[in-house]
């Protein structure tokens, strides 16, 4: 199954609360932190909401 490597590349400071909350729920805490998540529609929706703050790469595992 595909997985997504998600990296926080821009700080959520100054953005709406729901965007900050989405970053937190993705598991991203500090700038340049990276998490690996399953490629499911729920995660894709969260990424779409904060696409201006994160970098996403598809990986095979």
From Swiss-Prot:
Species of origin reads Thermosipho melanesiensis (strain DSM 12029 / CIP 104789 / BI429)
SUPFAM superfamilies found in the cross-reference section? Ribosomal protein L30p/L7e
Q: Does the keyword Disulfide bond apply?
A: no
Quaternary organization: Part of the 50S ribosomal subunit.
> Protein name, please?
Large ribosomal subunit protein uL30
Which InterPro entries does the UniProt record give?
Ribo_uL30_ferredoxin-like_sf, Ribosomal_uL30_bac-type, Ribosomal_uL30_CS, Ribosomal_uL30_ferredoxin-like
One Pfam family assigned to this protein is: Ribosomal_L30
| UniProt similarity note | Belongs to the universal ribosomal protein uL30 family.
Gene3D superfamilies documented for this protein: Ribosomal protein L30, ferredoxin-like fold domain
């Amino acid at each position: 199954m595909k997985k997504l490597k998600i990296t926080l590349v821009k700080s959520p400071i100054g953005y709406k609360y729901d965007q900050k909350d989405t970053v937190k729920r993705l598991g991203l805490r500090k700038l340049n932190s990276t998490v690996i998540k399953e490629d499911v529609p729920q995660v894709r929706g969260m990424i779409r909401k904060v696409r201006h703050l994160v970098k996403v790469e598809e990986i095979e595992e």
